[in-house]
Structures are given as C-alpha cells and as structure tokens.
C-alpha cells in the first residue's frame, strides 16, 4: 500500500511539473519529429520577399489521394503535421498570384521538409510547377538518418534482415558480443536501444533486444519495410526507454492501384568460395522467397497490404569430425595410460582421446559433422482506413516463426552434444494507430500495441547431461549447455499504450504525451540444473573421469602443485587423499557449478520457475520554436519510471536473512524501482547561410536505459529459499559451498537431497539497495553544408558519458584482495549494482548525394574512442572485475571500442536499363585482454584479430512489359575479396565463457547470390 502511495505521489509531482511547463510554453506553440509520420512546412513570399499571409496550401498524397489543407500565418508560414510517409503534391493558391504547384515532395518517417516558396503576381489564371525539395534540413536538431524505400529496396544484404541496414548510417556499429552481434550507437550498450514498429514497442523486455533477437534469421520481412529512421544521438523528449539509439521502422501500405511482388533469392555451395582457412561451406544452401500484394479496399478511403517471406537453409560444419591443427595424431586411439605426453602436446590427439572416451563411457558420439538447419518465415498484414476527414486508422499484424537447430553454438571444438535448438519461436505483434485532426493546428495520435513472443530453447539429444568444458587451447565442450538444461520455456507478452497531442500556434509547435508499457515474463529457467564442469586439460579430465583400471584416479581427483608451481602428483579424493604437505590443489577440476536444488520450504515456486512483471511509465512535454527564420530551438522534458517486481518471499526468509541488518551487506532483499528519471533535452538548428545551404546543429540530453528482466530474475529466484546452488573450486580446496561433500563423479551432480532447508554456503543473487538505471549524458554538434545541388558534406562530434551502468559483482570472491569470504556463511553473492561508468568520444566526416542524374551515394568515416569499466551487456553469471573492492582497476577501453570505421553506399543507373548498388564496410579490430591472464593494468590492452572489410554489390536489369509489370534478375556478390573477417566475441579464456550464443572462427566467405523478382 505504501509503495502504491509513493508511486502515486511521484506521478502526481510529474503531472504538476508537466502542467507547469505547459503553462510556460503556451505562447502556444515549428515542426517536431514524428515517430510514424512526417511533416511539411514552409514559408510563402512574393517576388519582393514579403510574406504572404492567408495563402491556401493543399497537400495530396500521390498514391492514396490522402489530403490535408493548411493556410499561412502573418509571417507566411504553414505547417502540416502527421503526414503518412510518401510523395505529395502541394498546390499553393492566393488571389492575384499564379498558382504554385510543388511535385514529388517526399515525406519520410520523422522528417520535417522545409520548403521556401515564392509566388509571382499574375492577372490571369496561371500555374507554375516546380520539382525540387531542399537538400539540407534546416530544422532538425538531432543526429538522425532516414533510409528511404530506395535504400531499403536496393541495398545488397546477405541475410535480408533489416537490422543489417543500420550500419549505412553514421554513428552506428555492429560489434561482436557474447550473445551474437550487438548494435551500438555512439559506443553505448546494445541493450540500451529502442526499436519501434509502426509506432509500437518492438523490444523483448526480458533479453533487452528487439523481438526475435539474434536467433531469428529474420523477424520482419524486408519486403514489408517502407523505410526507417535511425536517431543516433539527440533524440527529443518524445523518445524514451533508451540510452542508446532509436530505430523507427515503418511498414508499407496499400495504394489506389493494385501492386505486388514475388521474389526468390538463392545461395549455394557451388557459388561460394572456400573460407579464408581453406574450408568449403559443406552442403550449404539458402533459399529465401516470398511476395507482397497491396491495393484499395475502397478507392481513396481504405487500403490493404500483405507480405510474406520464408527461409530454408542448411550448413554442415566439420567440428570434431576433422583434424585439429596442422599435425595429425600419430596414434589412432590415444589413451592416458600409454600416451599422456602425446595427448598434452597435440590438439588432434586430445580430440581423439576425448571423443573416444565419451563414446566408450557414455555411448555418446561427439565426432560427427554438425548440421545447422534454419527454418524461418515472417508475415505482415496491414489495413489503412480514412474513417472520415478527421480520423485515419492504421492496423498492422506481424507474425514470425523461427526454428534453428544447432544454432546455439558454432564453434569448431565443440562436440555434437554441446548445442541447442532455438525455437520454434513465435512472435505476434499487433499495432493500432488512430490519427486525429482536430483542426488545422491541432492533431492527436493514439496508439496501442500487443506483442507476444514465445521463445523456447532446448538441448539436442545427449547422453552427457553435464555441461563440460575441457582445456584452454584448444578448448573443448560437451554436454547440455548450462542454460538449456534440458530446456527453457519462456513466454513474454507486453502491451504498449500511448497518446501524443500536437498544437501549432504562431512559430511554436508544442507537443506532449504519455505512455505505459506492461510486460509479463513467464519462464522456467533450469540453469546449471545438471551441473557445469570446467577442467584445465584433456588429460586432467581423463584422469578425473576414468577409473584406475583405465589409467585414471577417478571418480574424482586432485592435481597437486608445490609453491613453485611444480607438479607433485595426483590424489584420489574418493579415497580421502589430500595433497602432500607443502602442496595445494590446482586442478584438474577448476570449477563446478550446480543450481536448482529445492529447499523444500513451503510457499515458494519450484526451482527455476518465475513469473515477473515490469511496468514502464513515461510523460513528456516539448516545444519546437522557430525563433527566427534561420534559427529553430527544440527543448523538452521527459519523466520515466520502471516498476520492478517484488520479492518471491519475504527477505527475512532467505539465506541472507541474518545479514539484512548488517550495514556491509549491499541489499535489503528487494529490487528498488527507479521512479525519478527526469530527462531534459535541448537542441538548436541554425541556418548559417540564410539560404538553406549551411546548418549548424547541436543537442544535449539526459537519457536513461531500462533494466532488462534477465538481470532481474536471478535476484528473485536465487535467494537460497526457492532454490540454491553449489560451487566447487580450487579456492575452496575442492570442497563445495552449498553441500558438505567433495566434487561429484563426472558427469553426475552433487548428491544433495532436496528438502533439507537452506544449507550452509548457499549461493545467492541480490540487487543493490542503491540501484539506479543506467544514465547517459550526451552532447552532439553537427555541421552540414551543401556543396552543390543534391550534394552535401557533414561533420559530427558526439560525447557521451555514462554513469550508474549495471555491473554484476561477486562480493564474496576470494583472492589476493581477500583471503576469506566477506560473508563466510554464504557462497557466491552476486550483486546487481549501478557502479559502472563509460566515456565515448566520436568524430564523423561524411558526404551525401541525393538521387539525381541517375545516381546517389553516401560515405562516412568515424574516428572514436570508447572507454568503460565493464562492457557486460546482460551476462549475470560473470563477475568481470579484477578486484571487486577496487573497481577503478577495470577502467580501460571498452569491448566495443572500434577506433576506425568506414561505410560507403551508392546506387547507380548504369545505362541500358541496368542498375548497380555498391556497399563497402570496414572497421578495425576490437580490444581483448591478453591470453596470459588479467592483471591490475592490462584489461583490453591488446586487439583481437577480428578487423572487418567487405565489398558487396548488386547488378540488376528490370525487363518491363505491360504498363506496370517487370521481371528483374539480380546478381549479388558479398565479401568480394574473400576477407577473413574473423569472428571472436570472447572477452577472455574460452573455457570460462558463459555466453548464451556463440560463434567463433573465420567469417562468411565470398558468396554469390542469385535472385529474381517479379513486380506488378
């Protein structure tokens, strides 16, 4: 009750502040960014430069005949808000002047087209037609780019996933992360981004990524995308729930004519080069097919659009069926009894020894080639209905199905059992938008969306239940991945309700609104339920797991070393043997983790089960003020709150109950909800030339990221009461916290009886009592200059400073900084804290040419430096600090730091009906900590071998027949020069990797894609 009262009081304060701002700004209120629509504004003057008030302006969409009227004010200005993207004809009329017609004025999502118009006196009826729009936008203050229909349609994309177009825009990079590719804006974490589809939230609130994430080959059919806007920095107060970038995706609509398409794209092994290490893509083929159709339900009133796309793909990897390294093993069946030294020195002998051992002892074949089949299809339907002159309704439905077997891991040294089945995942999204014109100066947009994502994940069939990692280089893996043991059932659904109101008065455009997102996640996460073993070497594993008759010391063994690091012998733990005096255990089992053991306490959910909800609230008010004909000011305030779930059981019943009164214990057992997220945003655009050819833009704002639910769940379930875990490690002298026993017999689990209550040494997870959501302070300055008609250059500088970044710190670790645990009665204590920081500086130089004279292009170069003390996106299982009590030692260049980046894109009509599109992408390597191990000063002090360069291109020739039909064959080539483009997302030793999705090795080789498309 008290919590609800506090939330109500906070909301009341925000409403009062918003109302106060409203009163201040109602010298009532030039055009602002629209999430799903665009704006056309302009100034009408006569031949002498005098303003022409009361001039009538009619705007008509060429494809649907949707129309809007406006009239100029005393200063000759007009604004038409909330225009659906498309091409418009403007007709400007005034008594005594020749009618002025502007053709092909293109409105894109989020754009504000500013037209300087001049009318000439005429005593007779006369029409003057022009066909030109400004090259430089002199009213926008943010650093944003709109990828129009031509860019979406013509750019060669290897997988036809719309997210791969984002790197065409400056300030956006794709970096290799532990859960797949991450989209980073101005150096920020990928989980900070906000993706919207047709105005509705298109994010998975649990994983902190777009729906479908990296698992789905596609989540929206590219054929349905009309255009999208990318706001890298400087977003206005209307945009929330982001400390990174904003991506607005707008889908196509039907028109007065019936139009459609059918297409088929094909890649295959015969048209693919060997990878840079000389290996073919075995049995590779990819078929991508689909089509669209759209047209009128009723002319000028209602329209329909449908799109479908399917994918069928397979790829066979050799994995452990092929030799490892350059030297084959000289012994066909190496064993530790006869060949221990040979196994230690030869990676291929390790492969044979391990796979033969597992086949013999577990009847599990680990050395077969691995198929990676993909089955994916996406469908979108949309209806647009002009209800009357004042109301326009748009409803869209997006569905995606994805099932990808053996797509969890793509690592050459992983066995057949170390993989998972991603799916079948199903995404359902419904978006409803109602656009209402109350008067020529007042418009409203009401929105509701519902999304539901079912994302099951399971292991492949295996007789090895435990996730088993063996060795450092090479690093092998067998058994159920720890996060899929044996499966994860995850269902997320959310609703998004918002309303925005815009009001034009004089030289102000005032806008305010609010939104509410309700998210519910229902899952059973069986992480570490069947255990995870990490062994230092192949022979160490074989010694540990083999009985003495086979040359081992099993069922569990100690590897002893003296103080100088010299090996002193093996000891069998099952016999109660310990290391000799002066020696200590150093292996072979470096770490064992187990979770999901029930305490038997009544009134708590079963292990792994969690139903959690989040509520996100937002209010904003903003004004765009045309202070002078050459200066536009944008300013606003946004407030947000994220209401986190309450504890499953009272904190006084948890394993850490006795510590709640201890001032050194970092948590009170609850998740504190951030409710005071006030975010001022300001910006200006200054037309320096006073001719619309040179503009200086600048913006500053505070932006809050939201906390994904994956980071929340552990603190709800891992409380020692619902479930507890055990940890066995070298630092515990190979006893196990959470159980009074020695490490288990591989591949079994620690035999702890459920129902025994909370044990001594149970591991827990908590939220810090002073937790706050990540906060980013961003400043951007940009200069853009028109060199010639349709041709501009631009220079951009961005500075972003991050505070309160999420870090996962295990405060009960021991090491050189602590000889004994801080709280000896507990095992690991992972704290979700807000102590991280970051700093990004980036400079961009670019050129841009709009389509004219049969070609367009854009190129940009980015020089940047990105620093932080923890680049962890959402991995709650890993403490990446060197010393949890001195986090300043971790501050260095970020995992995402790409010092140099270059992008170029062009579309050219080559002649004879042939069209060409060319794309170049290049970036330098990401940093990594030396393989020798982390020290106090060497975090990310070296560079990986994952620098990237790719030259992609497409040639196509439409063959037209009839009035509106065309058949277009296409020839595409990707990675033309067959660059290695190595994939290395690891941030440390592969043995200790806890990624939920991992691909390593060489990148995609040169590939040819053949396609044909029929349009009508």
PLM feature segments, named:
Residues 97-120, 124-253, 268-274, 286, ...:
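Periplasmic N-terminal accessory/gating domains of Gram-negative outer-membrane beta-barrel systems
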């Amino acid at each position: 009750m008290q919590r609800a009262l506090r939330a109500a009081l906070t909301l009341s304060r925000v409403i009062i502040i918003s109302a106060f701002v409203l009163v201040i700004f109602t010298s009532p209120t030039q055009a602002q960014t629209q999430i799903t629509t665009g704006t056309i504004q302009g100034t009408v003057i006569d031949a002498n430069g005098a303003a022409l008030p009361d001039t009538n302006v009619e705007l008509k969409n060429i494809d649907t005949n949707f129309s809007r009227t406006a009239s100029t004010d005393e200063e000759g200005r007009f604004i038409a808000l909330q225009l659906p993207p498309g091409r418009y004809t403007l007709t400007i009329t005034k008594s005594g002047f020749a009618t002025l017609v502007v053709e092909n004025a293109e409105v894109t999502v989020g754009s504000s087209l500013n037209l300087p118009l001049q009318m000439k006196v005429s005593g007779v009826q006369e029409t003057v037609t022009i066909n030109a729009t400004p090259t430089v936008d002199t009213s926008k203050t943010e650093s944003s780019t709109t990828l129009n229909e031509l860019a979406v349609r013509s750019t060669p994309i290897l997988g036809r996933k719309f997210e791969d177009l984002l790197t065409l825009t400056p300030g956006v990079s794709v970096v290799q992360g532990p859960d797949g590719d991450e989209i980073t804006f101005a150096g920020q974490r990928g989980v900070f981004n906000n993706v919207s589809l047709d105005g509705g939230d298109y994010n998975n609130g649990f994983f902190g990524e777009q729906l479908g994430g990296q698992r789905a080959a596609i989540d929206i059919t590219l054929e349905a995308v009309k255009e999208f806007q990318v706001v890298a920095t400087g977003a206005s107060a209307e945009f929330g729930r982001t400390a990174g970038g904003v991506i607005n995706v707008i889908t196509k609509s039907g028109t007065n004519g019936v139009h459609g398409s059918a297409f088929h794209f094909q890649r295959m092994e015969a048209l693919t080069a060997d990878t840079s290490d000389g290996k073919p893509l075995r049995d590779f083929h990819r078929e991508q097919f689909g089509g669209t159709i759209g047209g009128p339900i009723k002319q000028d009133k209602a329209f329909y659009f449908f799109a479908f796309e399917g994918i069928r793909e397979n790829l066979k990897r050799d994995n452990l069926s092929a030799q490892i390294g350059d030297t084959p093993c000289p012994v066909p069946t190496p064993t530790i009894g006869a060949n221990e030294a040979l196994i230690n020195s030869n990676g291929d002998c390790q492969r044979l020894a391990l796979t033969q051992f597992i086949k013999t002892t577990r009847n599990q074949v680990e050395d077969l080639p691995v198929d990676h089949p993909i089955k994916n299809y996406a469908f979108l339907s949309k209806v647009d209905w002009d209800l009357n002159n004042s109301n326009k309704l748009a409803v869209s439905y997006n569905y995606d199905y994805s099932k990808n077997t053996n797509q969890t891991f793509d690592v050459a040294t992983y066995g057949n059992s170390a993989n998972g089945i991603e799916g079948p995942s199903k995404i359902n999204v419904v978006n409803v938008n109602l656009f209402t014109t109350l008067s020529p100066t007042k418009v409203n947009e009401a929105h509701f969306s519902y999304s539901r994502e079912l994302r099951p994940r399971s292991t492949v069939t295996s007789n090895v239940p435990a996730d088993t990692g063996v060795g450092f280089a090479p690093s092998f893996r067998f058994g159920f991945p720890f996060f899929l043991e044996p499966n994860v059932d995850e269902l997320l659904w959310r609703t998004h309700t918002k309303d925005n109101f815009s009001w034009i008065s004089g030289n102000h455009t005032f806008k305010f609104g609010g939104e509410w997102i309700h998210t519910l996640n229902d899952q059973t996460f069986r992480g570490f339920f069947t255990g995870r073993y990490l062994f230092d070497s192949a022979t160490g594993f074989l010694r540990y797991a083999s009985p003495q008759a086979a040359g081992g010391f099993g069922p569990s063994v100690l590897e002893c070393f003296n103080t100088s690091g010299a090996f002193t012998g093996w000891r069998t733990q099952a016999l109660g043997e310990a290391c000799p005096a002066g020696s200590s255990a150093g292996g072979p089992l470096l770490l064992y983790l187990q979770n999901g053991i029930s305490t038997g306490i009544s009134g708590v959910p079963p292990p792994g089960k969690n139903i959690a909800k989040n509520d996100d609230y937002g209010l904003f008010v903003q004004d765009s003020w045309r202070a002078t004909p050459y200066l536009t000011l944008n300013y606003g305030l946004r407030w947000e709150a994220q209401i986190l779930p309450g504890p499953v059981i009272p904190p006084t019943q948890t394993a850490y109950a006795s510590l709640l009164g201890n001032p050194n214990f970092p948590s009170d057992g609850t998740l504190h909800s951030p409710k005071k997220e006030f975010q001022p945003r300001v910006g200006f655009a200054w037309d320096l030339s006073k001719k619309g050819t040179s503009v200086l833009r600048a913006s500053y704002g505070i932006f809050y990221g939201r906390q994904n639910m994956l980071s929340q769940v552990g603190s709800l379930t891992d409380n020692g009461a619902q479930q507890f875990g055990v940890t066995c490690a070298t630092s515990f002298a190979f006893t196990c916290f959470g159980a009074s026993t020695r490490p288990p017999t591989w591949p079994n689990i620690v035999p702890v009886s459920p129902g025994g209550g909370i044990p001594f040494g149970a591991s827990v997870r908590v939220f810090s009592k002073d937790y706050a959501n990540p906060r980013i302070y961003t400043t951007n300055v940009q200069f853009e200059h028109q060199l010639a008609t349709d041709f501009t250059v631009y220079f951009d500088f961005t500075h972003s400073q991050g505070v309160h970044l999420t870090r996962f710190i295990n405060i009960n670790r021991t090491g050189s900084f602590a000889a004994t645990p801080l709280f000896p009665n507990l095992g690991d204590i992972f704290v979700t804290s807000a102590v991280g920081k970051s700093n990004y500086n980036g400079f961009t130089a670019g050129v841009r040419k709009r389509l004219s004279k049969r070609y367009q292009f854009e190129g940009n170069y980015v020089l940047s430096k990105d620093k932080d003390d923890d680049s962890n996106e959402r991995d709650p299982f890993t403490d990446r600090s060197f010393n949890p009590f001195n986090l300043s030692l971790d501050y260095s260049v970020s995992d995402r730091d790409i010092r140099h980046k270059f992008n170029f894109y062009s579309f050219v009509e080559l002649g004879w009906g042939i069209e060409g599109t060319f794309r170049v992408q290049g970036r330098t390597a990401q940093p990594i900590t030396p393989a020798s191990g982390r020290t106090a000063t060497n975090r990310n002090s070296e560079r990986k071998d994952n620098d990237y360069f790719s030259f992609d291109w497409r040639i196509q020739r439409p063959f037209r027949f009839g009035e509106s039909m065309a058949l277009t064959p296409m020839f595409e080539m990707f990675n033309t020069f067959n660059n290695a483009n190595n994939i290395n997302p690891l941030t440390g030793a592969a043995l200790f990797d806890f990624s939920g999705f991992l691909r390593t090795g060489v990148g995609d080789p040169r590939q040819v894609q053949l396609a044909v498309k029929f349009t009508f």
